Amino acid sequence: MLRSSFKTLSAKAAAQLDQELMSTGAFSIDQLMELAGLSVAQAIYKQYPPKKSCNNTVLVLVGPGNNGGDGLVAARHLKLWGGYDPILYYPKRTKNQLYSNLVTQLHDLDVNELESVEDVKRLVSVPQAGVDLIIDSLFGFSFKPPIRAPFDELIRYLAENHDKIAPIVSVDIPSGWDVDKGPTDLDINATMLVSLTAPKPCAARFVDSSAEKIHYLGGRFINPKIAKKYDIEELVDLYEGNELIVKFV
């Protein structure tokens, strides 16, 4: 499959598909988030396997919505598998019990948190701190610009320093991007993208921007009827055996 010749779902279609999964499909948001986050963790494990000498330090940037929840789930799986030390930055929290539970699960695994964007800057800018990877789970396909506080300063810092910091793995779309058109004024220049359910239109811009970009597909929970309705059967068919992720070549 060519790098950018894959089926995509618009933000509107992706939202409709999610609603269908949770209505007639009888999935709960907990299930979908767990499977999505597991896919992200597996893609990271495959692309950035644990070191033999020491753990990989993974900075997880968590947003206020479902995309952030996917990041929290991914952090838990990476911690449980061993070889990874996730650190959270979760500046804008929701009172939703689902997210509170995910954070509690991470606290029970002794996962640490950063308190401010200044803490993030200090951590990623010091080579000896050893941040090996950054998970961008700030904004998903429902994001609408402009970027507001407290995320504007963080996105700007990532965009201006992407060549000096650890590789960034974005969940579903690179944060700050327009889901259909791609990068806006600020581009965090993620190294890897994990598209969930189906790539969004901006994914084509992502892979075409550089031959070094890495693109995975995850979120294997689409039944054949829904796949046919949304014309993404060829994506579902890419999964092999019991694999939960696909790497686009």
Task: Identify what each model region corresponds to.
Residues 1-59, 249:
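An N-terminal, well-structured beta->alpha segment
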Residues 2-9, 21, 130-249:
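YjeF_N-associated NAD(P)HX repair module
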Residues 8-11, 26-30, 34-38, 72, ...:
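Electropositive phosphate-/nucleotide-binding environments in soluble metabolic enzymes
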Residues 28, 52-53, 116-119, 178, ...:
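Short, solvent-exposed coil/turn linker segments
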Residues 42-140, 146-171:
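Nucleotide and nucleotide-moiety/phosphate-recognizing core
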